[in-house]
Amino acid sequence: MQIIVNGEPRITQATTILALLLELGIEPKVMAAALNMNVVKKEAWESTLLQEGDKVEFLHFVGGG
């Protein structure tokens, strides 16, 4: 299916947010995710299904002082 990931079109076989992260080789522990402009809690990533045309945004947390 085709979705938008961080503003870029992407073809994916992933059906959930967690599967998409793993497909992209991204470490889930340090990420936040939004699906169609709605923040998705980490606990729901495995059960949140992706659909054709969805817009997914991943944000990486960086600590500092």
Where are these regions (language model features)?
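Ubiquitin-like/PB1-type beta-grasp interaction modules and other compact soluble beta-rich domains
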Residues: M1-G64
